Amino acid sequence: RDGANVDKLLVCPNGAQHRDYHFTEKPLKPSWTLYLGRIEPRKRQYLYQDIYGVEFVGKYTDTTSFDRNRDCYLGQWEHEYKLQHVTDYGNMMLLSDGENGTPLVIKEALVAGLGVVVSKYAAHDLDTSLPFVTVIPDDKWEDIEYVQMKLIENRKISVTMRKEIRQYGVDNFSWQK
């Protein structure tokens, strides 16, 4: 690529150590979506704060109109807490235009048994034909009713497929494969 000798390239894909992530077949919050990531403009969390059933976790940055005083913002989780509690949710969302490949947080969600609702930029190496992977088209990001409908549809499917989702995550994104 770009003139590099491919025999001397080593690609190290991003992945998650699935054994570190707590997994439950029945989530504690099956009707809730987790939006996990640094609060910043490219991830557009500020657009989705009015959607009931979405909780936001991540380091707050004052570069966006996201209101950190709302009940739906849970602050930043410590790593060990994240490992234990990602599995509590029905699914995860990430609608960002600044991703190069599938972000680690999406792979973590899958190994924890969560379906995902993502942008095409966050779905690089996901099998988008799977019923628990929903890709929101660019022209629908600001259509809050559409996004909410897709979150609900994905959650309903995802909470019934937790074992399959986890297995897909382990088979495709775990360091253990």
Question: Each predicted region: which residue ranges?
Answer:
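Donor nucleotide-sugar binding/catalytic pocket of nucleotide-sugar-dependent glycosyltransferases
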Residues: 1-23
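Conserved donor-binding/catalytic core segment of Leloir-type glycosyltransferases
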Residues: 25-43, 49-55
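Conserved active-site histidine-acidic residue motif and adjacent donor-binding/catalytic loop
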Residues: 39, 60, 69-88, 97, ...
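Short alpha-helical segment that forms part of, or immediately flanks, the ligand-binding pocket
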Residues: 83, 106-111, 125
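Acidic donor-binding loop of glycosyltransferase active sites
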Residues: 87-101, 114
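Short hydrophobic beta-strand element within catalytic cores of glycosyltransferases
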Residues: 106, 115-119
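Conserved acidic donor-binding segment of nucleotide-sugar-dependent glycosyltransferases
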Residues: 130-142, 151-155
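A charged, aromatic-enriched C-terminal amphipathic alpha-helix characteristic of glycosyltransferases
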Residues: 139, 155-177
